Amino acid sequence: IDRTTDGSGWVKDYTYEELKKFNAARVKGDQFGFQPVPSFEEYCAWAKNQSLFTNVELKTSIIYYPEIEEKTIALIRKYGLEDRIIFSSFNHLSILRMKELAPEIPCGALVGDRGLKYAGFYCERFGFEFYHPDFQTLTEEDVKECKAHGVGINAWTVNGMEGLEKLVEWDCEGIITNYPEVPVKYFK
């Protein structure tokens, strides 16, 4: 929680009541005042009435949270968000479990800065509809290989215009960004 709040430590070591006491707007200084960490259910309730598509990243690669996949899917279904969600994780066993539980919801194989050799083949083989690489290591050859296997690409973390232009030129399906104003400005 150090990276995104004014708290310190691991999420697993706190109850939700304790997590709500941390300021999730810390990274923006005083711009938004105090913003408590929302629960995933609070997010789903809010998202239900918004016109948006959400990448739900399961943070299970370092610490595994028992039944996180089942609980996540239950909330997605409770709020009717199945057609506006994509699941991703660095832990590909976790997204394999998501595919077992909710085969109708697309999944993306999230990978670090080393990428995956033959990512399209890999994703197709495991039933993942998307490949989520670091955009800085993605090559045009990677894009072609994925497309040859019917696998879409959502690259991360695209925070500047130059990276966005390259991915649009390569006909990637989506970007993951910390600054939504960048693609909004580009596509205006």
Predicted regions and their residues:
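C-terminal active-site rim and adjoining tail of enzyme catalytic domains
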Residues: 30-34, 108-188
